[in-house]
Amino acid sequence: MSKVLCIPDTHLKPKMFDLAERIIDKYKPDYAIQLGDNIDDFYSFEDDYKKANAKMIYFKYKFPNTIWLYGNHEVHALIDRPVTGNIYCSKTYAKLYQENFNPKLVHIDNKVIFSHAGIFNNFSLLNEDNLNNLDLNELAKADSPIWARHNYDKNLYVNNKYKNYIQVVGHTPEREIREDIVDGCKIISVDVFSTNWNKKFGEEKMIIINTLTGKYQKIDIDFRNDIY
């Protein structure tokens, strides 16, 4: 059993790691997992990338058992098909992320699957090792673990291999942490820190999930209005 702090898409918001640090200090989870998309905000400059990268490096060294995942923004920058407003920075810092943080596509702990967007369709036939060994170019698909949008794509399904699992995902901005059922599989969406034209959009909370029971706690810690 593990208690895991889930850090959703940060998109160059370094103070999300300040919040995560305070949560870890107070609630003592076994480890944290970051769900990808640390790069790219469409209103960003190189200085924003430098500040965010410095904060991530600090967090990595303070909490070395943190697990880091790929998001669609990192993967597409690495395969030279960036989805960003700052192509130079996204490619440079995606490479730094790959080299320094050893990101994975998927992490499974007991009966909980962590990925950027969810494991569906033919991807849900693969085990954890095979998923993590996929060529990054194979992920440029609408149903892939970095692109799937389970709230909108009604053609997604989950093979029997993972039907009894819970999935924790980021990727799709939500106003609140929410649960959905896709083909019998519970999906918990936690991307609630995204902004709309630089204005707060989601409830800005993180969860700690028990990977044995699947129960989770929303963590509500005020981290001041100066995050942006």
Model features per residue range: what roles?
Residues 7, 12-88, 92:
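Core catalytic region of metal-dependent phosphoesterases/phosphodiesterases
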Residues 218-228:
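Short, solvent-exposed aromatic-acidic interface loops
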Residues 6-8, 32-37, 67-72, 114-115, ...:
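Active-site neighborhood of phospho(di)ester-bond hydrolases with catalytic His/Asp-centered motifs
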Residues 41-43, 75-79, 115, 121-124, ...:
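Short catalytic/ligand-binding loop motif for oxyanion handling, primarily in non-cytosolic enzymes
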Residues 1-2, 28-30, 63-65, 110, ...:
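A general structural motif
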Residues 88-94, 104, 108-163:
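Active-site-proximal loop/helix segment associated with metal-binding centers of metalloenzymes
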Residues 1-5, 106-114, 183-186:
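Beta-strand-turn-beta hairpins that frame and shape the catalytic cleft
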Residues 150-220:
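Conserved beta-sheet core of the metallophosphoesterase superfamily
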